[in-house]
Design a protein with these regions (language model features):
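Scaffold/interface architecture of coatomer-like assemblies
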Residues: 1-370
Length: 370
């Protein structure tokens, strides 16, 4: 059993023991397993009637998730001290609980320089414009070949274990959003090599107001004890009036949903689950597919939106598509998945233009087909 597994198990095992440890570590005691409550109540009243309370505010701003010991020394004799042994230096997570596996990711983000032991992609994909901001999808892509596999003693199973963390911080450095996932995998040992040819992809939607932020991401290989982390500027523009257009992304695959549709996840259109292909490399073995969403302006209901997709190579237009748009779905969006009309390897730029009435929206992205 791994350390983080033990921590998670401890959250639910023997709650009375946990209460006792909490009480004693904070200078109190637990009343339990007794019908005689006179003595413990007398002790409580003595403590309430005659005591001094001291508070301690740490001066260090280094929130490294480590345990910091506290020691209280008295100049007078005959006094009894009730105090906790110390505290964990945890940052404010925007009101969200801190999970055991996230502590190691926070330590990676606190390192200088940031660790780079793993190759991964982490992108916040922009989707629906909303009043004051926009909806996004945070996507991680980690090649399975980056992870260390532990084979059991009988060589029957292989264990791989990755953890992901993304923090969104405002200009004051305060955490306003957290996205994380712990993904252990146990697979048959004879299928390991094929499994390592794929990628571990994790995506989660989130909403954010317009502004300038810092996006911090970390990925952990729990079996090897290695990590990688990045920090970047993240700017959210206020929504423009008129028809809207999401970011454009390459599609790794589209799978039929085997669970109820999640209307708040823009990567689940019309009963499918879109797995993005992050980075700028698309395999030439098959024509690449693009995915984006159009958001019609309800005030222009008489005019239907129209989309034009242009492909450029070395500044010259080499292909153009004008797909017919279906009606908007229940969320008011028009998801578009389009097979690019490209065959020759090379570097391409894609430009998407959406028009509805007098309003227009534009988007672009570039990739290598090789």
């Amino acid at each position: 059993m791994h350390q983080d597994d033990s921590l998670l198990y401890a959250l639910s095992a023997n709650p009375q023991q946990g209460m006792q440890e909490l009480a004693e570590s904070t200078g109190g005691f637990l009343i339990a397993d007794t019908n005689d409550i006179i003595k413990p109540l007398r002790r409580i009243m003595e403590d309430v009637g005659m005591h001094y309370e001291l508070t301690y505010t740490p001066t260090s701003q280094n929130y490294d998730c480590r345990f910091r010991r506290i020691e209280v020394k008295l100049a007078r004799k005959g006094l009894r001290v009730q105090a906790r042994e110390g505290y964990y230096a945890l940052p404010d997570m925007g009101g969200e609980p801190l999970l055991p596996f996230e502590m190691a990711a926070l330590k990676a983000l606190d390192a200088a320089p940031l660790p780079q032991a793993l190759r991964y992609h982490a992108v916040a994909l922009r989707f629906r414009p909303v009043p004051g901001g926009a909806d996004y999808d945070m996507v991680f892509d980690l090649p399975m070949s980056e992870l260390t596999a532990r084979i059991d003693g009988e060589h029957r199973f292989a264990r791989l274990h990755a953890s992901f963390l993304a923090l969104l911080k405002d200009q004051r450095g305060q955490i306003i959003g957290k996205i994380s996932r712990d993904l252990p995998r146990v697979i048959p040992a004879d299928k390991l090599e094929g499994f390592r040819q794929g990628d571990m992809v994790f995506a989660q939607p989130f909403a954010v107001r317009a502004g300038r932020y810092t996006l911090e991401t970390a990925v952990l290989d729990r079996e090897a004890g290695t990590a990688a982390a990045r920090r970047s500027v993240f700017v959210v523009s206020p929504p423009a009036p008129g028809v809207g257009l999401s970011g454009i992304v390459l599609v790794r695959r589209a799978d039929k949903l085997d669970s109820p549709w999640n209307p708040i996840d823009p990567l689940e259109p019309a009963g499918y689950r879109i797995t993005p292909l992050l980075g700028d490399q698309a395999p030439a073995a098959s024509k690449p597919s693009l995915y984006f969403a159009v958001y019609p302006d309800a005030r222009e209901s008489a005019a239907k939106p129209a989309v034009t997709v242009q492909y450029f190579a070395f500044g010259r237009e080499v292909a153009r598509q004008t797909p017919a748009l279906p009606p908007a779905d229940a969320t008011g969006a028009i998801p578009v998945m389009l097979e690019a009309d490209l065959e020759d390897p090379g570097h391409y730029e894609v430009r998407v233009t959406v028009k509805q009435g007098d309003s227009e929206a534009h988007g672009a992205m570039a990739f290598w087909l090789n």
